[in-house]
Amino acid sequence: MVEADRPGKLFIGGLNLETDEKALEAEFGKYGRIVEVLLMKDRETNKSRGFAFVTFESPANAKAAARDMNGKSLDGKAIKVAQATKPAFESSRRGPPPPRSRGRPRFLRGTRGGGGGPRRSPSRGGPDDDGGYAGDFDLRPSRAPMPMKRGPPPPPRRAGPPPKRAAPSGPARSSGGGMRGRALAVRGRDGYSGPPRREPPPPRRDPYLGPRDEGYSSRDGYSSRDYREPRGFAPSPREYTHREYGHSSVRDDCPLRGYGDRDGYGCRDRDYGDHPSRGSYREPFESYGDLRGGAPGRGTPPSYGGGGRYEEYRGCSPDAYSGGRDSYSSSYGRSDRYSRGRDRVGRPDRGLSLSMERGCPPQRDSYSRSGCRVPRGGGRLGGRMERGGGRSRY
């Protein structure tokens, strides 16, 4: 690295800033002829930077001058005199600037790296460029698993409305159950059609027409109302199951009207109570409630079977209540129910009414005989009958 500059060139450092080329030439001219005096100055201020280069014509003169003048005082300052070296000089001259230039890049890097590093790390923390958006979406998926959870629930929710469209696969199940529920709803209406039409109270019809006609998707929103509605038009099983299982809400809804009027219902309650599968009544009832209650996602697969069983209890409940528990199991067997459910899914409009007409005329008879539905028919059942007409529009 340390290469001597051309022979006879001396480096003079530590100069007084006031010392100029003339003073240097006068001082060093004693040792020989000087070819060049180069005082390094600041470009901007044009002031001396404190060092200079003096080139002697004879290298021997340069050596003598360096030997004598090194460490001597010039203009009040001790000066350093040495053989100029290219790298030493240029590194000393440019070297400090290059360090500075390097320092500046480092500084800039520091700003870029420091500032940019923080920026990057925040960006990593935040959008993370792509990772951050991925992170962002990961967060959203974590939220969005709420969205995505929400997302999947919408398919189940859609599973509610798809009953109209005979939704595919899993939804189709709940759609089967849902169509069944709808068919039962209509069937229940037709089954009670005789009594209900006598006293259809518009207030009931209007509120229920809203949720019902808005679609089974309203099943999501109207879970509580739909929950009651099955009680309304199929109160027999629901009231029964609720009586058996102590759901006071239904007892409050229909006890005096439905059971108070009929001692026979008490007997039939005992009849059903004796039935060994009381728990199964409750389970299908609950699963059916889930299906209708807007948790199709939860209850879809069970709700199909549950719905079927519940429908059996429900659609045939009049027979069962009339004492035809066996006839309920035989004539309204699950296979019959399921085939009806399929018909309903295939033919949501006609299938409902036809299967109702075919499947549950006994309901109408038994209910007209028992009469316990008449008061409720005047209430919710009437509204549902009217809605039955409205639903067939779908």
Curated annotation (Swiss-Prot):
GO cellular component terms attached to this protein's record: nucleus; ribonucleoprotein complex
Compositional bias annotation for Pro residues: 150-165
Subcellular location: Nucleus
UniProt superkingdom: Eukaryota
Official protein name in the record: RNA-binding motif protein, X-linked-like-2
Organism: Macaca fascicularis
Keyword entries, A-Z: Nucleus, Ribonucleoprotein, RNA-binding
SMART domains per the UniProt record, alphabetical: RRM
Biased composition regions of type Basic and acidic residues, renumbered to the chain: 67-78, 196-231, 239-285, 334-350, 383-394
Residues in RRM domain copies: 8-86
Keyword Ribonucleoprotein: yes
Pfam families: RBM1CTR (PF08081), RRM_1 (PF00076)
Composition-biased stretches (Low complexity): 321-333
GO molecular function: RNA binding
